[in-house]
Amino acid sequence: MNDLDQLEKKIMDEIAEAGDEQTVEAVRVAALGKKGTVSEKLKTLGSMSPEERQVMGPAINGLKNRVTEALAARRAELRDIAIAARLEREKVDVTLPMPRPPAERGRIHPITQVIDEIAAIFGDLGFSIAEGPDIETDYYNFTALNFPEGHPAREMHDTFFFEPDEKGERKLLRTHTSPVQIRTMEAQKPPIRIVIPGKTYRSDSDATHTPMFHQLEGLVIDKTANVANMKWVLTEFCKAYFEVPSLNMRFRPSFFPFTEPSLEVDIQCDRSKPGEIRFGEGNDWLEILGCGMVHSNVLRHGGLDPDEYQGFAWGMGIDRIAMLKYGMPDLRAFFDADVRWLEHYGFRPLDLPTLFGGLSS
């Protein structure tokens, strides 16, 4: 037993003096390796009598376990020492100003910028933001919005349908954000004042259309909402968005299944210079959005009594009004992931649009 005590002391001293991982490994091999001192002791158990093995077996195995634990503890200690030394060597004074990057690459996409501008304008007018699912049912996308059977929008060439489920029902990618109007009417009681920015999907692709685009819709429901209120809201929005002090707008009769009466809105502009549009001046007109009083059938589908409540709604393409305001000629470039395009048309991340500080500073 004295031999084991002396051997243990020797090995433990070597472990304690080991100053790096390589030395610790050398001590391990010398003690526990195939021909190590502790391993050799274990080999002698086979030549001992049963009585001797009862005494020496636990003693030698206990030594092996203690050496193994000591080696692991020393390795962990050396790792902690190395980490502390590295932290001391590589420490950073966080009180010093950060050096400016050689080039500011990150930019906010124009669509994100325009949605933020829209939120700032309508937020100032007392509206809240509403959202809904991109994958919709036929009921919310068409039926509840007064689209009759056989309407062209229900055809495959205009709408992306999924395969029918086990019940024979087909989900679809929403063709407008109008389904959120129905969901909002179902979920809350009037008065309702919401705007709904979001992605929409239609089977169309050219310089001014893409299969996926962004749309803004608005909805106001209460007991006294009228066309005059709608004209005021839309005029104030267009003046704020295009950042002009005054703006003439023209409301023309139109048709949408979900509104009655339905109107299309043109805004005053000057297109006398090629490739340039100036709003709030000139003798030209440009169609900007569609609007109207919410159809009584839509109110009923939303769970409201049209004899008690009325409202107005409008919709416009976010991508299109972004192109008009910031002079971008091709809608398809919005989705090309070209960093050069984004550096040219994008916005600095910290320039958040506000009515007080300027929408597009």
Curated annotation (Swiss-Prot):
<dbReference type="InterPro" id="IPR045864">
    <property type="entry name" value="aa-tRNA-synth_II/BPL/LPL"/>
</dbReference>
<dbReference type="GO" id="GO:0005737">
    <property type="term" value="C:cytoplasm"/>
</dbReference>
<comment type="subunit">
    <text>Tetramer of two alpha and two beta subunits.</text>
</comment>
<keyword id="KW-0067">ATP-binding</keyword>
<dbReference type="InterPro" id="IPR004188">
    <property type="entry name" value="Phe-tRNA_ligase_II_N"/>
</dbReference>
<dbReference type="InterPro" id="IPR004529">
    <property type="entry name" value="Phe-tRNA-synth_IIc_asu"/>
</dbReference>
<dbReference type="InterPro" id="IPR010978">
    <property type="entry name" value="tRNA-bd_arm"/>
</dbReference>
<protein>
    <recommendedName>
        <fullName>Phenylalanine--tRNA ligase alpha subunit</fullName>
        <ecNumber>6.1.1.20</ecNumber>
    </recommendedName>
</protein>
<keyword id="KW-0547">Nucleotide-binding</keyword>
<dbReference type="GO" id="GO:0000049">
    <property type="term" value="F:tRNA binding"/>
</dbReference>
<feature type="binding site">
    <location>
        <position position="260"/>
    </location>
    <ligand>
        <name>Mg(2+)</name>
    </ligand>
</feature>
<dbReference type="InterPro" id="IPR022911">
    <property type="entry name" value="Phe_tRNA_ligase_alpha1_bac"/>
</dbReference>
<keyword id="KW-0479">Metal-binding</keyword>
<keyword id="KW-0648">Protein biosynthesis</keyword>
<keyword id="KW-0436">Ligase</keyword>
<dbReference type="GO" id="GO:0005524">
    <property type="term" value="F:ATP binding"/>
</dbReference>
<dbReference type="GO" id="GO:0000287">
    <property type="term" value="F:magnesium ion binding"/>
</dbReference>
<dbReference type="Pfam" id="PF02912">
    <property type="entry name" value="Phe_tRNA-synt_N"/>
</dbReference>
<keyword id="KW-0030">Aminoacyl-tRNA synthetase</keyword>
<dbReference type="InterPro" id="IPR006195">
    <property type="entry name" value="aa-tRNA-synth_II"/>
</dbReference>
<comment type="similarity">
    <text>Belongs to the class-II aminoacyl-tRNA synthetase family. Phe-tRNA synthetase alpha subunit type 1 subfamily.</text>
</comment>
<keyword id="KW-0460">Magnesium</keyword>
<dbReference type="GO" id="GO:0004826">
    <property type="term" value="F:phenylalanine-tRNA ligase activity"/>
</dbReference>
<dbReference type="InterPro" id="IPR002319">
    <property type="entry name" value="Phenylalanyl-tRNA_Synthase"/>
</dbReference>
<dbReference type="Pfam" id="PF01409">
    <property type="entry name" value="tRNA-synt_2d"/>
</dbReference>
<dbReference type="GO" id="GO:0006432">
    <property type="term" value="P:phenylalanyl-tRNA aminoacylation"/>
</dbReference>
<keyword id="KW-0963">Cytoplasm</keyword>
